[in-house]
Amino acid sequence: MDWISSLLLATVRLAIPVLLISLAELYGQRAGMVNIGLEGLASIGALVGFLTCYITGSNWLGLLCGALAGLLVNMIYAFSTVTLCADHTVYGMALNIFAPALASFIYRVYFGTGSDLKQITTMSSVAIPGLKDIPVLGPLLFDQSPMVYLTFLLVLFTAIFFGKTRAGLSYKAVGEHPQAAATLGIPVVGVKYLACVICGALSSIGGAYLTTCYSSTYTDGIVAGRGFIALAAVIFGRWNAGGILLACLFFGFCDALQIRLQVSGIAIPYQFFQMIPYVATVVVLSLIGTKQAGPKANGKPYRREQR
């Protein structure tokens, strides 16, 4: 029972960074912005969040600075794709190559190339009195980092925003038919830039979570493909906040399972266990990838003169 409880607890904690990055992509794609540079943005967030927390001792300031760094970096993508109508995929891939290398370079410039691993104090858990004593579910849901609670609230807000509000419907119209949205008076370019702001900030917070709330250290490759898994989670969740939550919990479970199997003593090379989350991603995309269609204007340049 303890093994199962610890597995479920790790599932929730490991699902959070993927969930944050997935929500970032959801806000982007709902406005027609397909940003595949999530891995790079999360890497920037992880490094800046760690450095800020290391210098100031504040986890919250680390998360905030990580969000700002990702936001600023993503403005390059926004200007290129929204204003210059450049290809989304090319700039997203460039971001995935450039940002992790930049993060690694900055880390080595600041700390040097020594072998000692720098550490910070991660964000403490906040228990909810009464609820935390519920068997199994108590520690799982009500004795977590504040970022876990905030992320679940963000899922709820996102579901209500896109499903129940007029602003959310206008936002989605930009991703479905921007020309028609423009004729209704919706500021298409403004919404697309807003989507890039949200995407840059949230995906970087997902990376900063890994260093300030989960691992307490920064290492090259700490994001470990979660940006690409988040892309799969958006498709798996059918561009719906609730579906994305379930998809991220599934991927979080796969990640937690591979960690537990590595220390289980099973006489199998650990690399096979490390493959589990990525194999699960490939399988999921193979099963449902061709059956799902996102917003109709995803990745397509918007030009005012086409109205």
Predicted regions and their residues:
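Hydrophobic alpha-helical transmembrane segments
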Residues: 8-11, 40, 60-68, 90, ...
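Short loop segments and helix-boundary regions at transmembrane helix junctions
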Residues: 30-34, 73-130, 224-225, 229-242
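Transmembrane helix-bundle core of multi-pass membrane transporters
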Residues: 100-164, 265-273, 299-307
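Cytosolic-side transmembrane-helix boundaries in multi-pass membrane proteins
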Residues: 176-190, 261-307
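Transmembrane alpha-helical segments in multi-pass inner-membrane proteins
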Residues: 214-278
